[in-house]
Curated annotation (Swiss-Prot):
Its cofactor is Mg(2+). Pfam families: FBPase (PF00316), FBPase_C (PF18913). Keywords: Carbohydrate metabolism, Cytoplasm, Hydrolase, Magnesium, Metal-binding. This is Fructose-1,6-bisphosphatase class 1. It comes from Psychrobacter sp. (strain PRwf-1). Mg(2+) 2 binds at residues 106, 109, 280.
Amino acid sequence: MTSLTQYFEQHPKLPQTQAVIDVITTITNVGKQITDLLRQGALADIHGEAGAENVQGEQQKKLDVIANDLLLEALTANKHCAGVASEELDDATPANESGELLVLFDPLDGSSNIDINMPTGTIFSILPHNNKGQAAQNADFLQKGTEQLAAGYLLYGSSAMLAFTLSESLDANNEGVVMFSLNPSTGEFELVKNNITIDADTKEYAINASNARHWLPPMQQYINELLAGSSGPRGKNFNTRWVAAMVGDVHRILCRGGIFIYPKDTKDPNKAGKLRLMYEANPMSLLIERAGGASTDALNRIMDCEPTDIHQRVAVVLGAKNEVEYVQKLHQQA
């Protein structure tokens, strides 16, 4: 088996590529610590609420705070990291002014799953620091998803998995999306899949149907067509899947296809969506597109969105290309 270290040694020794590799290595090392804490569960006193809200107005779990602090400490110590932005913190944290990279992360996606031993994960996005030599500020992070140098996630489930992709400009070996599994015997992430591709068609979809009454008409139409099955306009039966953690649903799509949807709804008309553009939608969109899928906010490509705030929210439809394009067509025609 090829370890993560061996895999990275096969890449060209270009300065920017090596900097990105070093940052990904730092993140995966923290992921091993989070994996150990999750395995201990209640024995490590990581269950339950932390007793505070994050900037999103969400109740923080104890492990939300722990994972955030571990990542923040490790990344600010990395010489290549000029600044860090976390879903859990109001503002970006400056790190090393001479660093050439910015890192955004969701320290523990799906943290409501912690106490019931269901999948959670860490999502990350790496951007260039275009004001090298100056302290990183929130505005430095406001780059389109197309500017990402790399993105990925760590999934903490029955096994710990790492999936990531380098941008086309850095992926000299043309390996697209790659996936590693943590070997508990060696403590090393080992390569299990590369050049992952997503089928353009699917029979599986992931959406929280409890919000159906709040969806916009085009989304209601789309899901009703799927529910009609083989006797409806789609002429085939679909299955619903829902992990309650974006990282788990995207992992399933990379492994066996499907479409993931967290649409805009009318519960709070002032919000464009539920998920965060910079910490969740952009990194997952890069992964999905590099695997041959598509990603949209139901009207436009997510990675073309011009961010105005590091905590900006967005609707998300991603996965099987033909399904995503059909959802977008319904919304554009509405």
